[in-house]
Amino acid sequence: MARMNRPAPVEVSYKNMRFLITHNPTNATLSSFIEDLKKYGATTVVRVCEVTYDKAPLEKDGITVVDWPFDDGAPPPGKVVEDWLSLLKNKFCDDPGSCVAVHCVAGLGRAPVLVALALIESGMKYEDAIQFIRQKRRGAINSKQLTYLEKYRPKQRLRFKDPHAHKTKCCIM
């Protein structure tokens, strides 16, 4: 019942990257959250909001939970961006096509901004990244976050030489 007012999880796929954008579960809704993660094959969850559930049940199911909280409605701090991109580079080089779940409270601000950054770092224009995400997650990304993405200058940290690079584990840095 708690999920009725929340948007359903959405998958965003681009090149060899897959993301699951979702809202935060509670301990009461954790079992359905874990089912969603398994359905999409997500083995890593990035939590960018305050803790609302015990991560032990996820870890018991082999799902890694990473905590990088930052303020609601705000763009991510530089350290979160660096850690996020580093995690993705390792994850998608080692296991192309795998899925990384990311959530904030409603799945409309902080989580979509991180996914947009990944798309931009992989070569997509910021306008296209925002449109791509908003097609699947209506209402995502507020004006402050939009300005941040517009001014963001990618270093192409997620440009992959070859979508089949997993054979050589070779990524462009």
Curated annotation (Swiss-Prot):
A lipid is attached at C170 (S-farnesyl cysteine). It catalyses: O-phospho-L-tyrosyl-[protein] + H2O = L-tyrosyl-[protein] + phosphate. It is found in: Cell membrane; Early endosome. Residues 8-161 form the Tyrosine-protein phosphatase domain. One of its GO terms (biological process) is positive regulation of non-canonical NF-kappaB signal transduction. The keyword Hydrolase applies. The active site is at D72, C104. Inhibited by sodium orthovanadate and peroxovanadium compounds, and by pentamidine. It is an enzyme of class 3 (hydrolase). The keyword Transferase does not apply. The modification Cysteine methyl ester is found at C170. SMART domains: PTPc_motif. Gene3D superfamilies: Protein tyrosine phosphatase superfamily. GO terms for molecular function: protein tyrosine phosphatase activity. Farnesylated. Farnesylation is required for membrane targeting. Unfarnesylated forms are shifted into the nucleus. Substrate binds at R110. Residues 171-173 form a propeptide. Disulfide bonds join C49-C104. Its EC number is 3.1.3.48. Keywords: Cell membrane, Disulfide bond, Endosome, Hydrolase, Lipoprotein, Membrane, Methylation, Prenylation, Protein phosphatase, Proto-oncogene. GO terms for cellular component: cytoplasm; early endosome; nucleus; plasma membrane. Protein tyrosine phosphatase which stimulates progression from G1 into S phase during mitosis. Enhances cell proliferation, cell motility and invasive activity, and promotes cancer metastasis. May be involved in the progression of cardiac hypertrophy by inhibiting intracellular calcium mobilization in response to angiotensin II. Interacts with tubulin. Belongs to the protein-tyrosine phosphatase family. This is Protein tyrosine phosphatase type IVA 3. It comes from Bos taurus. The lineage of its organism: Eukaryota, Metazoa, Chordata, Craniata, Vertebrata.
